[in-house]
Regions:
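Non-transmembrane, solvent-exposed beta-strand/loop segments in proteins
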Residues: 1-180
Length: 180
């Protein structure tokens, strides 16, 4: 079981035609590794945990990871925290143009473990899940939520089930951008 939290710092440049948006965010991944029980609290070398879920963004178009750090948070349980600070362009996973330009969009950041099936990693939303208040430019944020999903084994060449987590931001276009 892997707990995933997030903090959205900013969001903008929603492009309904190119089906993408710009986002600045942090992802926090928490898991326990018994191999770290009794070790010294503090920074941990990346990749040193055999149970590292190796979480990645599945709808990244041009995403840059500016910093990554992993730390042992609780030596008595082997609790580890991996933090990633990312900024860039994400593809829209779902888009509705029914009321364009008077539209709302569910902008999503999808995360999944790299090549680890549900027997190894199950992603669960938890911990810090927040969005900074940022200037209401063209879009206004009405809320955010996290949802866990599992793939259909019939769509997999190996018949495996994979876990994923979607951070969903409900955005509405400000009326000043389409009413003159």
């Amino acid at each position: 079981e892997v707990i995933v939290g997030y903090k959205i710092n900013s969001l903008g440049d929603v492009d309904s035609i190119a089906a993408c948006f710009e986002v600045d965010f942090k992802i926090f991944i928490h898991w326990n590794d018994p191999a770290f029980v009794g070790k010294e609290k503090g920074p941990v070398k990346k990749g040193s945990s055999k149970l590292d879920p190796k979480v990645e963004c599945m709808n990244a178009r041009k995403l840059v990871t500016y910093s990554e750090e992993c730390a042992l948070k609780n030596p008595s349980t082997g609790a580890l925290k991996h933090s990633m600070y990312c900024r860039g362009t994400m593809s829209m996973l779902a888009m509705d143009l029914y009321m364009f330009p008077f539209d709302c969009q569910n902008l999503q950041i999808g995360v999944k473990p790299n090549k680890k099936d549900i027997h190894d990693v199950v992603l669960i939303a938890g911990g810090e899940c927040s969005i900074n208040s940022f200037p209401r430019n063209e879009w206004q944020c009405h809320g955010h939520i996290c949802r866990s999903y599992h793939t259909d084994p019939t769509n997999s060449s190996t018949g495996k089930i994979y876990s994923s987590l979607h951070i969903i931001l409900l955005m509405e276009r400000e009326s000043g951008w389409y009413v003159k």
